[in-house]
């Protein structure tokens, strides 16, 4: 059975693309059939996946998989949603995991009814992070009718020297969502930041603690 997961960003620079690529590539490495569906142009994502661009900004790849999708060099397939407002029914057969990656939350309204889970990324470098995540959840609630539609919050770019700020943000989010919906935070690390430049993933790094942080996310997703 396919699981459709929409990955949203509470603000710019929250790690939406980084988290999606590393989760999708891990599942693909484990033998799962995975698709990343792009809603709105994401140049960083396309370059990271090793997709060339045509003159009119359409991604290209030497290999096609399912009709309309492209193979990537890190494992998951890629699909440009364009104006589509739903996932083609054949994709439910072709894939086990589909990650929807809208450029902005405002572009996700038509996608929400088709999603099984909502994952929201946020950065602890941002001021009022908790408030922005809660505001996004309340906006999504107004669209879905669900009182707490966000299934998982991933705090990214945590600075281990700023425990007061980290604890305050975690406490506010845990009070609102419940601790079970707050993932273990991902550390701020230049090695992670540089991964797109080398078209690599966290699974190719030697730092076990970084791989473990993402693997804990994978374990949550596989339980959904």
Regions found by a protein language model. Give the residues of each.
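Anionic-ligand binding region
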Residues: 127-151
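NTP-binding/hydrolysis catalytic cores, primarily Walker-type P-loop NTPases
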Residues: 199-224
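Inter-motif core of Ras-like GTPase G domains
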Residues: 107-126
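Gly/Ala-rich phosphate-binding loop of Rossmann-like dinucleotide-binding domains
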Residues: 24, 28, 112
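Beta-strand-loop-alpha "switch" segments that mediate conformational coupling across diverse proteins
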Residues: 157-203
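Acidic-aromatic/histidine active-site loop/patch
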Residues: 1-4, 141, 145, 150, ...
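P-loop/Walker-type NTP enzyme "switch/lid" segment
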Residues: 9-14, 29, 33-96, 104, ...
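Hydrophobic positions on the alpha1 helix immediately C-terminal to the Walker A/P-loop
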Residues: 19
């Amino acid at each position: 059975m396919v699981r459709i997961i929409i990955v949203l960003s509470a603000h710019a620079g929250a790690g939406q693309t980084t988290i999606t690529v590393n989760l999708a590539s891990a599942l693909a490495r484990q033998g799962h059939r995975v698709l990343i569906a792009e809603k709105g142009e994401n140049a960083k994502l396309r370059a990271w996946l090793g997709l060339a661009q045509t003159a009119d900004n359409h991604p290209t790849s030497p290999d096609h998989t399912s009709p309309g999708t492209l193979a990537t060099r890190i494992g998951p397939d890629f699909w440009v949603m364009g104006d589509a407002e739903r996932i083609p029914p054949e994709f439910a057969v072709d894939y086990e995991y589909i990650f929807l990656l809208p450029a902005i939350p405002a572009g996700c309204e038509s996608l929400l009814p088709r999603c099984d889970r909502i994952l929201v990324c946020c950065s602890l470098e941002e001021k009022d992070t908790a408030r922005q995540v809660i505001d996004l959840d309340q906006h999504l609630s107004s669209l879905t009718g669900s009182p707490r539609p966000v299934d998982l919050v991933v705090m990214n770019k945590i600075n281990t020297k700023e425990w007061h700020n980290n604890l305050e943000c975690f406490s506010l989010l845990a009070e609102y969502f419940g601790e079970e919906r707050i993932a273990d935070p991902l550390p701020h690390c230049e090695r992670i930041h540089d991964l797109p430049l080398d078209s690599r993933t966290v699974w190719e790094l030697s730092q076990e603690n970084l791989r473990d942080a993402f693997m804990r996310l994978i374990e949550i997703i596989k339980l959904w």
